[in-house]
């Protein structure tokens, strides 16, 4: 699963990056709607969100971008990632209807607790989508077990505490955490600090898919003045991460 910030640095270059990811083997795109206080994200994604929002980018613009991706790459699942405020503002049910109409398959809203989601899970399912809750190593064991056995088809496992961006070491504690998240039979997406093929291979026997985001945003930032280089570097990294 590959993560992009919608509209960064422009819609066209964001689309170029998405095409590079798909051509490089990504079968799930996680598209982040820019938010002013992305509390789970590191400097690369925070900076991208800030730049896009300065242009006056709106939720409607992000959904239009997702719809374009869905029409261009119908074989690819699209997950929408953002924060609770963007979901609450238009109303949870209204937001979910709009997301589903744009082609969204699932929602990842990391600041909404799985058991106090203001009706997000029900609204997602009513519109043919899944809410994908986030599990973190900092969760108390009893609460983590409650999430694991809550019946969600998919759970996003944040592989360490803190924010996205810096590299994560895959060790025995990581594996024990993933075992705990999977205890109820949910399929697991593992992310936070994934940037290399070796990390992806180390996780491949325990997760449905790895999630990589900051590494792609950094490549986009480094090459935003050269679309050809942007495409080539993003595609090469996607190929590295999907070759197991």
Which role fits each region the language model picked out?
Residues 1, 72-83, 124-134, 181-191:
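Short beta-strand/loop segments at the ligand-binding rim of alpha/beta enzyme cores
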Residues 1-75, 89-92, 229-239:
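Conserved N-terminal beta1-alpha1 strand-loop-helix module at the mouth
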Residues 2, 21, 32, 99, ...:
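Conserved, mostly hydrophobic/aromatic
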Residues 5-10, 81-89, 113-114, 135-139, ...:
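Glycine-rich beta-to-alpha transition loops that act as phosphate-gripper elements at the mouths
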Residues 11-23, 139-150, 185, 190, ...:
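Catalytic cores of alpha/beta
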Residues 26-38, 106-108, 116, 155-165, ...:
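Glycine-rich phosphate-binding active-site loops on the catalytic face of alpha/beta enzymes
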Residues 36-47, 54-67, 87-93, 109-126, ...:
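Active-site-adjacent beta->alpha loops and helix N-cap segments on the catalytic face
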Residues 179-186, 195-201, 207-244:
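Alpha/beta catalytic cores of nucleotide-metabolism and tRNA/nucleoside-modifying enzymes
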